[in-house]
């Protein structure tokens, strides 16, 4: 395991990374002032670090100039920053994005799962950028067990994030394999958050922390403590919020989290849009606001 991957693994252990959204208008325009205030607010409210341009941040859809500007604003906050790379049809896209992330001071990259040779893709990123990587077991493209073992032996891989949503056995497998390989087991399980910690996850990188950060941070804090009732209560609050935001159509969760961020005053209404997700009925917005405590039940 490369020393840089060891350093990232150890730095992230026990932390909550907010998988930040990218606030934008209905037409996809990004206001960097809004982005700066939004990212700073996530950190102020309990995020130990930031994952930008990942699945929640719609990284594959954004131009290199916008990507660079978002990374710069995240890095300026002085917390660990992980950048999502890959997911675009460009063959060299992930390697180019990783080089940019490294040059701008990011601490690591979260590698979108791709078709074909996943290990080869990680190796190409490692050769191009030499930046520590977090593998990604995502519900839209789960990682086969043998491939996962190979990835977790790569010297540049610091850990793996599991985001399988409802596959408890798959989540448990990823956590076990990561720990056996001496890598960091990172939960991205918004719908199995408390259980994934009990199964051995050592850090969190979740889209649920794109708003209402304190709800997720309270679960992490309670888990580190010794009060089982506090952990149960905090997990219950998180589960109620996740039930309203991480539901079918699942890709709509980004829009739901942006609605919640707007309800909290983190972003203006004009920038609470996800033009890349499925259309959602307006009545869902009220359900999300109620789950977040912004409308009476």
Segments and roles (model prediction):
Residues 2-6, 17-21, 45, 198-201, ...:
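C-terminal alpha-helical cap/extension of soluble enzyme domains
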Residues 39, 98, 175, 193, ...:
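Short glycine-/small-residue-rich flexible loop motifs, especially phosphate/cofactor-binding loops
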Residues 36, 68, 72, 95, ...:
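Generic alpha-helical structural signal
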Residues 139-249:
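Catalytic alpha/beta core domains of metabolic enzymes, predominantly
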Residues 2-144, 276-277:
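Active-site beta->alpha loop and helix N-cap motifs at the rims of alpha/beta catalytic domains
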Residues 69, 73-78, 100, 104, ...:
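Alpha-helical structural signal in soluble globular domains
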